[in-house]
Each structure stands twice: as C-alpha cells, then as structure tokens.
C-alpha cells in the first residue's frame, strides 16, 4: 500500500515544477521498507519534500509514529477526486484537500494566501542548492525538457527567481464544488468563509498582496474596493497598438466605479517578472497605450504598499479617479490592518 501524502508535504509537492519532479526518484513502498530506512535515505523525501513527511490515514488503528512520518487522521468520506496518483511511488491529496487539512493549523490569512497561490497563475518554489545545480545540468545536457508548462520568471537582474509561471491548479468551479463537499465537516465553515475572499488568477504574490490590501473588506484590514478584476486582457486600438507594437496587453488589477463608468488600471511592479504574454514591453509604453484606451493608470510598488503614508495617498488617488468618496478608517478598522 502506498503512502498518501498530505498537509505541508503535499503542499511542497504541488509547488514543485514538473522539471524538478522529473529528477526525483520514487519513494520506497511501505511494505518493502517497513522500518523506513530506505525512506530516510531517499533524496525525494529528504531533500525535496523534507522530514517529517505528513501522511493521511482514515482509521485510528492505522496510526503509527515512525520518526520520519507524522500522520493526519481524516474520518468520514473524502471529497470527490481528492486523492491522486503520482509517478513517484505515493498518493497525494488534491490541492484543495491539501489546503483543507492544512487549515487546521493555519490562520485565516495564511489559508487565504495558500488558496490564492493554488488558484493563481504562479508558484513559489525555492530549490535547495544541490537540486538547483542538478536541474541546471539536466537542462543544459538536454536530459529533460524545459517545456513542461511551467516557466521560471527572471528576477530584476535577470537571474532565475523562485517565482514560476503555470496554469492555475484550482479553478473557481473546483473551489465551489469542494466547498459543497466539505459543508458540515469540521473546519468546513471556516474554509468556506475564507474561500469567498480568494482572488482567482493572480500572476504573482505581489498581485495577491495588492488585491487583498485593496479588495478585502475594511473590517478585515483591506480598503473595501469591490469587484476588482485580475489580469484583464485588453485588445488595443490601432493607435494604442502603434505605441507598444502588440495587439493586446494585460492589466494586473482593474478597479471600476460602482456605475462602471470609470476604471483604474493598477500595474504591480514586483521584484520578479510576471512572465505573462506581453512581458518585455516597457512599462512606460504599456502605461501610455492603456491611457490611450481611456484608462487611468497607476504603478504600484512594494515600497509604496509598505509605507502607510504612501499607500494611503494611493488609495485616496484611486478614490478620486473613481469619483468615490474616501472615508478615514475607524479605530476598529485600523486595528484590523495589523491582524
């Protein structure tokens, strides 16, 4: 019988690019390694996933306590399609079941960030130095392909970053279905409440952070802007196309006034490239092209959102552009910003 990985072990697996998974040897089967000596020496477990490994068991009498493994007990029926096969000798909980099990020991914000990454177009994966070197050798020698659907984003200095571009692991309909499956389960109500706040389709951690700061209700520490859209594709007019030499660009965050007449495009200037279609365009050109299309455009940086005064000025500027009234936060709303 194969191990069923869950919790942080499964989360680390789902963060692994396929290029890296291709380098990983399978785990030994428990019946062939009953004392788990082989598991301890296995590089996939020891280097990539890390000890202790977290596994899921379905009955109390199957719980054991080897030093290299910690077990999570899940009683009752599992959600649909929540256990998946891998090519590495073990089973894995689906991304959503992984997050649900992790929610037992995560804060609401931590759970929200986990779900935002799973529902986003990115993964954060920092590789150990030895694995990084092995990946480089394998790619340079042609031993593995680089066309696995995940693309590494460059940092500002052009070096490889820890940010990878990929398709979303979880779609909005997947999240809705999973929530219906866990309704009534322990921790289910909390998970469903957090899931209502998850941004879908964010292209970077910075986009998630900006979305939450602007879009969360004020009672939860945000600014309460409603209906924020992420990564909105804009087909350019002939004149705007001439500015950038492209037929389309993407708006990181699009805010609209309640009546829909005014819109503000926010471009997140992160430390690593988003890696989307349209990358390589100079920010000034993209900004000018969007302005030619009638959008008000703001550039947002880490430094700006980290400084309370600067961020407050940006929020007020957005309100002016949307013809909305800015209201100072109450003491309770200010306290929520620190939670």
Model-assigned labels for residue ranges:
Residues 154-339:
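Surface segments flanking catalytic/ligand-binding clefts of nucleic-acid enzymes
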């Amino acid at each position: 019988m194969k191990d069923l990985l869950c919790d942080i072990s499964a989360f680390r697996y789902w963060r692994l690019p396929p290029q890296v998974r291709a380098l990983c040897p399978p785990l030994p089967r428990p019946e062939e390694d009953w004392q788990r000596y082989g598991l301890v020496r296995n590089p996939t477990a020891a280097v990539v996933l890390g000890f202790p490994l977290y596994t899921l068991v379905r009955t109390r009498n199957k719980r054991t306590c080897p030093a290299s493994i910690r077990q999570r007990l899940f009683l009752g029926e599992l959600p649909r399609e929540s256990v998946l096969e891998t090519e590495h000798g073990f089973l894995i909980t689906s991304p959503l079941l992984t997050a649900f099990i992790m929610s037992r020991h995560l804060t609401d914000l931590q759970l929200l960030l986990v779900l935002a990454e799973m529902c986003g177009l990115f993964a954060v994966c920092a590789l150990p130095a030895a694995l990084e070197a092995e990946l480089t050798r394998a790619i340079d020698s042609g031993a593995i392909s680089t066309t696995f659907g995940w693309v590494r984003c460059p940092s500002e200095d052009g070096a490889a970053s820890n940010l990878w571009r990929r398709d979303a692991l979880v779609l909005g309909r997947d999240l809705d279905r999973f929530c219906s499956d866990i309704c009534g389960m322990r921790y289910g109500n909390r998970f469903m409440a957090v899931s209502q706040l998850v941004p879908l389709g964010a292209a970077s951690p910075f986009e998630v952070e900006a979305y939450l700061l602007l879009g969360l209700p004020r009672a939860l520490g945000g600014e309460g802007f409603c209906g924020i859209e992420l990564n909105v594709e804009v087909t350019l007019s002939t004149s705007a196309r001439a500015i950038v030499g492209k037929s389309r660009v993407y708006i990181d965050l699009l805010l609209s006034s309640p009546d829909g007449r005014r819109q503000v495009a926010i471009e997140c200037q992160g430390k690593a490239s988003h890696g989307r279609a349209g990358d390589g365009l100079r920010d000034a050109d993209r900004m000018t092209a969007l302005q030619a299309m009638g959008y008000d455009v703001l550039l947002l940086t880490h430094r700006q959102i980290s400084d309370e005064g600067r961020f407050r000025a940006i929020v007020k500027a957005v309100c002016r552009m949307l013809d909305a009234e800015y209201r100072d936060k109450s003491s309770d709303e200010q306290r929520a910003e620190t939670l």
